[in-house]
Curated annotation (Swiss-Prot):
Annotated Mg(2+) binding sites: N174, E260, F262, N263
Cofactor binding note of this UniProt entry: Binds 1 Mg(2+) ion per subunit.
Keywords in alphabetical order: Magnesium, Metal-binding, Methyltransferase, S-adenosyl-L-methionine, Transferase
Cystine pairings recorded for this chain: none
Protein name from the UniProt record: Probable S-adenosylmethionine-dependent methyltransferase At5g38780
UniProt organism field: Arabidopsis thaliana (Mouse-ear cress)
Amino acid sequence: MSTSSQSYPMSGGDDQHSYIHNSSYQKAGIDGVQEKARQYILENLDLLNMNPNLSTFTIADFGCSIGPNTFHAVQNIIDIVKLKHLKESQEDSRVAPLEFQVYFNDLPNNDFNTLFRTQPPSSKQEYFSVGVPGSFYGRVLPRNSIHIGNTSFTTHWLSKVPEEVCDKNSLAWNKNYIHCNNLIEEVTEAYKVQFEKDMGVFLKARAEELVPGGLMITLGQCLPDGVAMYETWSGIVKDTIGDCLQDMATLGVTTEEKIEMFNLPVYFPQVSELKGAIEQNIRFTIEMMEIVSHPLEAVQLSNNFITSMYRAILSTVIERHFGGSVVDELFRQFAKKLSEHPIDFEKCKKQMVYHIVLKRK
């Protein structure tokens, strides 16, 4: 069963600040690899070897948030599987008609009400839906119950902040920063160790839930080897948010002590770190691993786009630590700083998108 972990879902609801209206960056990443995923599944998914009498095909989206991207990703998978099923049924009469069961998983305080309220009506004729609350850093579904698992832009969220980075007596104390920007070697090492541990737990749980021959599709962001987080636009954004918090402490809105104890449970691995963490799990084979540019990485994103996206992503974790009254002022200050000092995207080093397909042995 799922083990306890820090719980910071995306901003819920359906207002202007919610994740549902501020996740187009993530959708662009999903769209960017859709054709490659389609091609792989068509060529490699073997329904007959899974079970010639298979009548219910099960899909799980881990870290689904509140939509709409989860519905988009799931529908892509279903469309591909239906096409593959049609092809196999024409070639072999043993192939049974298929129904689809989809499990939508996220943290218990994820806004599942908004998720299912905004589910496309057409999808209800395509598959049966189930919400599964629980951290994916542990099992959330029965053994051998899933044919395809999917997760998109989730595993950079750690199960917890490494304890050392909040310890004033540790060399890894991250006093002047709110995230792992790779400026302090000991901080980077603490985050890296936590990421490797979490990825191991994640893959172990998925290996138990997937049927033999089942696929785990993982999409997320990483850093090219040798690139530091502070050199990317995303790193600059988080450092700027940290600067805004310092300004608010000066004004008495929050305190230095609270800021010193605040770190984001987020780590973007370098490519070699990511591959090493995945290869540790012997119950999967790496069927495909590609590192590609995000479709929007070369675009000069507007200040409003950046502010809205990061508010939707970070407001829950910020509110939990500093209190809800801080959020509005923080992002007002953040928008002001971006206006005064726009990010020069051309000078920033690029984060990359990893697209990995694993097969359960």
